Swiss-Prot record:
Principal EC category: lyase
Family that this chain belongs to: Belongs to the serine/threonine dehydratase family. DsdA subfamily.
Subunit comment: Monomer.
Protein name in the entry: D-serine dehydratase
Modification N6-(pyridoxal phosphate)lysine occurs at: 116
Enzyme Commission number(s) from the entry: 4.3.1.18
Keyword hit for Lyase: yes
GO MF annotations in UniProt: D-serine ammonia-lyase activity; hydro-lyase activity; pyridoxal phosphate binding
PANTHER family assigned to the protein according to its UniProt record, in alphabetical order: D-SERINE DEHYDRATASE, THREONINE DEHYDRATASE, MITOCHONDRIAL-RELATED
Cofactor requirement: pyridoxal 5'-phosphate
Length: 440
């Protein structure tokens, strides 16, 4: 307790985190893209290479997963306006939301129904390509749909993949790895939903369950993989490859906006609200968005009050040297995808200058908004995916933040507020009914 008091003396906001209060923190260390980019350690070239790799795999994905065929083997989600939800939020919270609210439906991405279909699938494909190229079975000029042949499945079956997950990352990596032909083991934390484990097992994936939280599942997965030279461990806490898989979203969103005739510039700012667990997904997406829109995009991470690991790490500057458990928080939340106690040190250090802020919200707030979105827009998400929905009213109420950035009323009126919906498209009906029953 004495240590917590010392921490609070240095970092007053920790008191609100410990009290599980809904908290908003605007980052005083935010810089321009030009100043912040060198600290990421990755470049636009890296993201372009990821884009090209996904293009090489498109013919394979179009055949392996027919639901991607219409998009030519591209795994991408829609952006939709949510005017009725915007009005409902204004009514419920008594706060005008200037500008227009949009929803990015990664919740309905093909293959695994979550944002993790971006990073998880990309890293599995990257590993498969590397093995096939090294073995001389493939060149980058080939039509990658040859990977569907029995010879390739046979080749990949000598190798295995392991990952630790609270659910969605395991789902995307498990389904993709099994399709390629890898043997795959997913180490699941205690908060992983039963239906996600069942779905993985139906794809022939080995699921190892733990009574502990996410950090333990990752650690055990890492250990198990170390003893097998043919086993590749996908490290959600440190993976640059996962990060780049998410980052591709930036250019793609820019193209979607161009198609819709939506302008993002200094007088039409873009605010993006990203649910955050360990940080890889939102970190990678935010990096891609910064490369695509520069200083005209403002990114915020959203976390449960019971799992504010990234806010704690970035705000104190301690990053992965501190966990929410260290300050007496239990890391138990209905937002299972965000139930992470210790943030990625890589993502925190890479992105701390490129985030405008972080905030927390209560589980009940997520349930309430889950219900409102279903009522108003007919869109059903899992609790985690609503974390971003609390962002617009917080930003519109934050006069000091607006003044610091010099936003005029006109600019705010021209703003786009993009809420990144991270999952929920594959939640079974009975489970969804339970979620809806918890909203007020």
């Amino acid at each position: 307790m004495e240590n917590i008091q010392k921490l609070i003396a240095r970092y007053p906001l920790v008191e609100d985190l410990v009290a599980l209060k809904e908290t908003t923190w605007f980052n005083p260390g935010a810089t321009s893209l030009a100043q912040g980019l060198p600290y990421v350690g990755l470049t636009e070239q890296d993201v372009n290479a990821a884009h090209d790799r996904l293009a090489r795999f498109a013919p394979y994905l179009a055949k392996a997963f027919p639901q991607t065929a219409a998009a030519g083997g591209m795994i991408e989600s829609d952006v939709v306006a949510i005017p009725a939800m915007q009005k409902r939020l204004e009514k419920e919270y008594g706060q005008t939301i200037d500008g227009e609210m949009l929803l990015k439906k990664d919740s309905h991405l093909a293959i695994s129904g979550s944002i993790k279909a971006r990073g998880g699938i990309y890293e599995v494909l990257t590993h498969a390509e590397k093995l096939a190229l090294e073995a001389g079975l493939l060149t980058t000029d080939d039509d990658y749909s040859v990977l569907l042949s029995p010879e390739f499945k046979q080749f990949f079956s000598q190798y295995s993949i392991a990952v630790g997950s609270t659910g969605n990352l395991g789902l995307s990596i498990g389904i993709m790895s099994a399709c390629i032909g890898f043997k795959v083991t997913v180490h699941m934390s205690a908060d992983a939903r039963a239906w996600k484990k069942a779905k993985l097992r139906s794809h022939g994936v080995t699921v190892v369950e733990y009574e502990d939280d996410y950090g333990v599942a990752v650690e055990q997965g890492r250990k198990a993989a170390q003893s097998d030279p043919n086993c590749f461990f996908i490290d959600d806490e440190n993976s640059r490859t996962l990060f780049l898989g998410y980052a591709v979203a930036g250019q793609r969103l820019k193209a979607q906006f161009a198609q819709q005739g939506r302008v993002v510039d200094a007088s039409h700012p873009l605010f993006v609200y990203l649910p955050c667990g360990v940080g890889g997904g939102p970190g990678g997406v935010a990096f891609g968005l910064k490369l695509a829109f520069g200083d005209n995009v403002h990114c915020f991470f959203a976390e449960p009050t019971h799992s504010p690991c990234m806010l704690l790490g970035v705000y104190t500057g301690l990053h992965d040297a501190i966990s929410v458990q260290d300050i007496g928080i239990d890391n138990l939340t209905a937002a299972d995808g965000l139930a992470v106690g210790r943030a990625s040190g890589f993502v925190g250090r890479a992105m701390e200058r490129l985030l405008d802020g972080l905030y927390t919200l209560d589980d009940q707030t997520m349930y309430d908004m889950l219900g409102w979105l279903a009522q108003e827009e007919g869109i059903r998400l899992e609790p985690s995916a609503l974390a971003g929905m609390a962002g617009p009213q917080r930003i519109c109420a934050a006069v000091a933040y607006q003044q610091r950035h010099g936003f005029s009323q006109t600019q705010l009126g021209n703003a786009t507020h993009l809420v990144w919906a991270t999952g929920g498209g594959m939640v079974p009906e009975d489970e969804m009914e339970q979620y809806l029953a918890k909203g007020r």
